[in-house]
Curated annotation (Swiss-Prot):
This is 40S small subunit processome assembly factor 1. Residues 134-147, 222-238 have a biased composition (Basic and acidic residues). Part of the small subunit (SSU) processome, composed of more than 70 proteins and the RNA chaperone small nucleolar RNA (snoRNA) U3. The modification Phosphoserine is found at S73, S78, S86, S279. It comes from Homo sapiens (Human). Keywords: Acetylation, Chromosome, Nucleus, Phosphoprotein. The gene is FSAF1. GO terms for biological process: ribosomal small subunit biogenesis. It is found in: Chromosome; Nucleus, Nucleolus. The lineage of its organism: Eukaryota, Metazoa, Chordata, Craniata, Vertebrata.
């Protein structure tokens, strides 16, 4: 695409050597915008080319802003000349890039990687957290003072328990000894013997008896038990007979109804108009009381 020098006032001003009055800045900006519209208004462009152009324009804007920020502020007299040179160089770059198309557009991550300075990466590396792992084996190698104290404490506790048990045993034996004194002399000796065996003394040997003598002793014991049972039965029979006689007498007394069953003292039946009226129940009571006497 060709750019007319007549349409661009900046180009005409640069070509004309005898131009005495430089144009104002608003007219220069208007001319730049017209050239941009003419340059980007070609027909038959595909959507892909439009996207590529947009990306290129964005990159150029970013680069231009960065260059302007980096450059020192120029003097007020040299502003117009700098604007003219930047406009002419801008159009030249556009033409060159138009003729030789770019091989590939850089992607987003590449642009970000280029924009990020290396100092920030170093800071990120320094901010990485460091985690230390301590194994349990190393801890076991170091002597534990707490364990030694724990091992010493159980021995003290065992001693305390032993003393407590000893005191309880002693108290139990004292109570047992005091209880033995309450019995007679004959039984007291037997209980003392049992107490000595309980404390650890050897029991006395059993007396050996002949087999025939032992059988006779067993028979005598059986006979004594049978006699006791027979006497107990006889006494029970005698007591039962007495109880039966007493119960019979009580039952007879209960069966004989009393004349004073109505609760009135010396009165039988009911008085009505000066006459005593006896019911058949009252007559039966009177007859039964006479028979009982």
């Amino acid at each position: 695409m060709r750019v007319d020098s007549s349409a661009d006032p900046t180009m005409s001003q640069e070509q004309g050597p005898g131009s005495s009055t430089p144009p104002s800045s608003p007219t220069l900006l208007d001319a730049l915008l017209q050239n941009l519209y003419d340059f980007g208004g070609t027909e038959g462009e595909t959507e892909q080319k439009k996207i590529i152009k947009k990306r290129e324009n964005k990159k150029r804007d970013v680069m231009a802003s960065a260059a302007l920020a980096a450059e020192p502020s120029p003097l007020p007299g040299s502003l117009i000349r700098g604007q003219r040179k930047s406009a002419s160089s801008f159009f030249k770059e556009l033409r060159e890039e138009r003729h030789c198309a770019p091989s590939g557009t850089p992607t987003g991550p590449e642009i970000l990687a280029a924009a990020v300075p290396p100092s920030s990466l170093k800071n990120n590396r320094e901010q990485v957290e460091v985690v230390e792992f301590h194994s349990n084996k190393k801890r076991k190698l170091t002597p534990d003072h707490n364990k030694n104290t724990k091992q010493a404490n159980p021995s003290v506790l065992e001693r305390d328990v032993d003393t407590q048990e000893f005191n309880l045993e002693k108290a139990r034996l004292e109570v047992h000894r005091f209880g033995i004194t309450g019995y007679g002399k004959g039984k007291e000796r037997i209980l003392e013997q049992e107490r000595a065996i309980m404390l650890g003394a050897k029991p006395p040997k059993k007396s050996y008896v002949n087999y025939k003598v032992l059988q006779e002793q067993i028979k005598e014991k059986k006979a004594a038990k049978e006699e006791e049972k027979r006497l107990a039965q006889e006494t029970d029979i005698f007591k039962k007979k007495k109880r039966k006689g007493q119960e019979d007498r009580k039952s007879k007394k209960k069966s004989a109804p009393s004349i004073l069953s109505n609760g009135r003292i010396g009165q039988v039946g009911k008085f009505k108009n000066g006459t005593l009226i006896l019911s058949p129940v009252d007559i039966k009571k009177i007859n039964s009381s006479r028979v009982a006497k």
